[in-house]
UniProtKB/Swiss-Prot annotation:
Keywords: ATP synthesis, Cell inner membrane, Cell membrane, CF(1), Hydrogen ion transport, Ion transport, Membrane, Transport. F(1)F(0) ATP synthase produces ATP from ADP in the presence of a proton or sodium gradient. F-type ATPases consist of two structural domains, F(1) containing the extramembraneous catalytic core and F(0) containing the membrane proton channel, linked together by a central stalk and a peripheral stalk. During catalysis, ATP synthesis in the catalytic domain of F(1) is coupled via a rotary mechanism of the central stalk subunits to proton translocation. F-type ATPases have 2 components, F(1) - the catalytic core - and F(0) - the membrane proton channel. F(1) has five subunits: alpha(3), beta(3), gamma(1), delta(1), epsilon(1). F(0) has three main subunits: a(1), b(2) and c(10-14). The alpha and beta chains form an alternating ring which encloses part of the gamma chain. F(1) is attached to F(0) by a central stalk formed by the gamma and epsilon chains, while a peripheral stalk is formed by the delta and b chains. It holds the Pfam family OSCP. This is ATP synthase subunit delta.
């Protein structure tokens, strides 16, 4: 439910801001959103004893140059008790800008981290193939094989070593 509410604010910001203004808003929100990972900050924001004006002042203190659009957004969110939606609004704006620039984020799941040249090679090849600018993040885990996921475009490619072994065993048994 909160995602739908955040999408409304994102849509409103996109309609109100020009492209360069939207980038400035995104930079400002990035500084603010990073504070939401600090427990003390969340305690202050949720505290009923701290006035809304003081909360807005605290949030604006994270910005080097306060933006009128950000200030108005903060006032509206604070008035409606939805200041906790800021991280989701930030993600929505970031995603919208990326989509308008034809940029997509992908994930590579492997057992070990891939080196930077390999990731760059994959980014280049997928960017050419999909006619978009693709950036990958490597996530090391217990995945035996390689899985590439570009969820925004609906692409998922996986190669499992276990599956290869079973297919080879099956093929050898059929050949005998």
């Amino acid at each position: 439910m909160s995602e739908n509410i955040a999408k409304r604010y994102v849509k409103a910001l996109i309609e109100v801001c020009k492209k360069d203004e939207l980038n400035d808003v995104l930079k400002g929100l990035k500084a603010i959103v990073s504070a939401f990972s600090v427990a003390k900050f969340n305690d202050i924001i949720k505290s009923p004893t701290v006035s809304k004006k003081d909360k807005i002042s605290l949030i604006l203190s994270f910005l080097k140059e306060p933006n009128v659009k950000i200030e108005n957004l903060l006032k509206i969110l604070m008035k409606n008790g939805r200041i906790s939606l800021l991280p989701q609004i930030y993600d929505g704006i970031k995603e919208s800008i990326a989509l308008s620039n034809n940029e997509y984020q992908g994930k590579i799941y492997t057992k070990e981290n891939l080196d930077e040249p390999t990731i760059k090679l994959l980014e280049t090849n997928f960017s050419k193939k999909l006619n978009a600018n693709i950036k990958f993040v490597c996530i090391a885990g217990n995945y035996t094989g390689v899985k590439i996921d570009i969820s925004d475009l609906g692409y998922e490619i996986s190669f499992s070593i276990d599956r290869l072994k079973s297919a080879m065993s099956e093929y050898i048994l059929k050949a005998i």
